[in-house]
């Protein structure tokens, strides 16, 4: 789980306007951070299958947000991909 301060920092980095908390960029960045944390968790806890299911759901949600962004605003999509270092 992300700490409140860490989540706030991510929102500050990726927001598109002053009160932005739900734009696709912010959601993708938060999901990417959670995915990275869970990936590290699985290195130590290989048999944690319940959390693995959660990880797969997060990856799927991030993929759909990326697809949405790619469909409606390709420039923002490319920017997010580059900032986060996600494969296409």
Swiss-Prot record:
Q: Which GO terms describe its cellular component?
A: cytosolic small ribosomal subunit
Q: List the disulfide bonds.
A: none
* Record-level Gene Ontology MF annotations: rRNA binding; structural constituent of ribosome
> Per its UniProt record, what SUPFAM superfamilies does this chain match?
S15/NS1 RNA-binding domain
Q: Does the keyword rRNA-binding apply?
A: yes
Q: Which UniProt keywords apply?
A: Ribonucleoprotein, Ribosomal protein, RNA-binding, rRNA-binding
On whether Repeat is a keyword of this UniProt record, the answer is no
The source's superkingdom equals Bacteria
How far does the signal peptide extend, from start to end residue? none
Q: Which SMART domains match?
A: Ribosomal_S15 (SM01387)
**For this chain's UniProt record, which GO biological process terms are given?**
translation
Report the PROSITE patterns cross-referenced here: RIBOSOMAL_S15 (PS00362)
Q: Tell me the NCBIfam families matching this sequence.
A: S15_bact
Q: Which family does it belong to?
A: Belongs to the universal ribosomal protein uS15 family.
Q: Subunit structure, per the record?
A: Part of the 30S ribosomal subunit. Forms a bridge to the 50S subunit in the 70S ribosome, contacting the 23S rRNA.
Tell me the HAMAP family matching this sequence.
Answer: Ribosomal_uS15_B
Q: What does this protein do?
A: One of the primary rRNA binding proteins, it binds directly to 16S rRNA where it helps nucleate assembly of the platform of the 30S subunit by binding and bridging several RNA helices of the 16S rRNA. Forms an intersubunit bridge (bridge B4) with the 23S rRNA of the 50S subunit in the ribosome.
Recorded protein name is Small ribosomal subunit protein uS15
Q: Which organism is this protein's natural source? A: Koribacter versatilis (strain Ellin345)
The gene designation is: rpsO
